[in-house]
Amino acid sequence: MGLVFVMLAVISQAQITEGNDGKYYAENNALYNGTYKEYYTEGNVRMVMNLTNGVADGKAMIYFQNGNLKESRSYKAGKFDGLWTTYNNQGVKIAQASYTNSKKDGKWYIWDGNSVLRYEMQYTMGQKTGTWKEWDEKGSLVKERHF
């Protein structure tokens, strides 16, 4: 019975296609609504995202081939919206970004593989704002820029 379930899941997933317009369609050419998954050729999950009217809406999770989380993204009606977090292959958080309506908006952070904060940036609706900071590998502040 388990084999039948897996086969049905693969078959139903194969019927969702991405159109030239970047939207996802069900087999009847209707815009797809629901959970969409992509897989690596080895069978491991590469991406899981929710689609509404054929576009990303809500959380999207991207995975490395080893199964570790690579990115967590947020969308609203197909646009970048909310927090995006990136991890390295070992599961260490290396970046955090914020978007509103597909524009960089809010604080952005970049860490090195040892979890040392290296950069802090600020955007307001796509424009560089505030104080941007840079730290060295020991965590000492080395540069500040004001926008």
Model feature map: region roles:
Residues 10-147:
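Glycine/tyrosine- and acidic-biased, solvent-exposed loop/turn segments at the edges of beta-strands
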Residues 1-9:
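Bacterial N-terminal signal peptides
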